[in-house]
Design a protein with these regions (language model features):
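Acidic low-complexity segments
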Residues: 80, 85-137, 148, 204, ...
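Histidine-anchored nucleotide/phosphate-binding helix
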Residues: 173-189
């Protein structure tokens, strides 16, 4: 794009784990799964003490517009429903599960079959997907804006401008097929013309890899977009401007500018859900910092405790 760049700053990068393949975290003895993992109304537990649950089984839901269902990340026995103080000062309801380490898959897990936009939106809600870049806004709502007929562009936020984190970087190298599939599904059912993956220039291997996969598949309506490695290129307003040249003033949403935008992990999870039927039960994350002897990226079950 020919427009000027918005003001940003250079921060030192400590991407120690960029070259490390993702590891799968061992299943812990106990998980505590919050019923408030999203913006909006918290879920109500649908299980009780003594119930045996399996991976992917529905644990909580609520009949509210802004919410998302929550599923079990492990197989094991529910040992209690607890309440604890949340990070923002409220009260969280937790489903506590003693794991059996078997990771038995819930029998009803199967890839969804959809034929139209309402079916797609329902499937995305059933998956429990929320924005996985930090905001945790329910994805099925973001994919169905009021002015959906005016939306034409998909933007994937893969900037990952934080100094230490490399989990999105590893996802782009390791889960490329799910990422592209998730984008194609969203574009097909929402009716979007073009898609962009915004990636900072300090990830040349991810850019080259995705470009090759797109070329090999003959996909021409999805492109990578190289961003400066400056902070905060991953901020919503900055990313929309960098890719489209359109300014998001106060009170303006991406959809108001014809854009649907979400994190790269979210789209990869869309692809994974439609491929396997497994809802959101795990998250890839970077473990790094001065107190960490062996920095790495791990896939951890939701509810695992530090």
């Amino acid at each position: 794009m020919s427009h000027k760049h918005l003001h940003s700053i250079h921060v030192n990068h400590y991407k120690h784990t960029a070259g490390c393949a993702t590891e799968v975290m061992p299943i812990p003895d106990v998980v505590k799964i919050s019923m408030s993992q999203h913006i909006g109304a918290p879920c109500k537990p649908l299980v009780q003490k003594g119930d045996y649950v399996k991976v992917g089984q529905l644990l909580g839901d609520v009949d509210a517009f802004v919410s998302a269902p929550i599923h079990s990340s492990v197989s094991g026995t529910v040992t209690g429903i607890e309440e604890q103080r949340s990070a923002v000062g409220g009260v969280d309801t937790l489903v506590v599960i003693e794991t059996d380490k078997k990771q038995e898959i819930y029998e009803e897990i199967k890839p969804p079959v959809v034929e139209d936009l309402p079916g797609f939106i329902k499937a995305v809600r059933d998956s429990g997907l929320v924005g996985l870049g930090g905001a945790s806004f329910p994805t099925h709502i973001k994919f169905n804006p009021k002015n959906i007929d005016d939306v034409h562009t998909l933007i994937v936020n893969a900037a990952e401008c934080e100094p230490f984190i490399t989990s999105d970087h590893r996802l782009m190298l390791e889960d490329t097929e799910d990422l592209i599939s998730g984008m194609q599904l969203a574009m097909k059912y929402i009716g979007l013309d073009e898609g962009f993956i915004g990636i900072e220039e300090n990830k040349p291997d991810a850019i080259a890899h995705i470009d090759k996969v797109l070329a090999d598949k003959g996909i021409t309506n999805i492109k990578t977009f190289k961003l400066q490695a400056r902070y905060p290129k991953g901020a919503e307003r900055v990313l929309v401007y960098e890719i489209t040249g359109k300014t998001m003033n106060a009170g303006v949403l991406p959809a108001d500018l014809g854009v649907i935008l979400s994190n790269v992990t979210t789209f990869a999870k869309v692809g994974e859900y439609f491929r396997t039927g497994m809802p959101l039960v795990s998250k890839r994350m970077t473990v790094d910092g001065d107190a960490v002897a062996q920095p790495k990226n791990v896939i951890a079950p939701i509810g695992a405790m530090i």
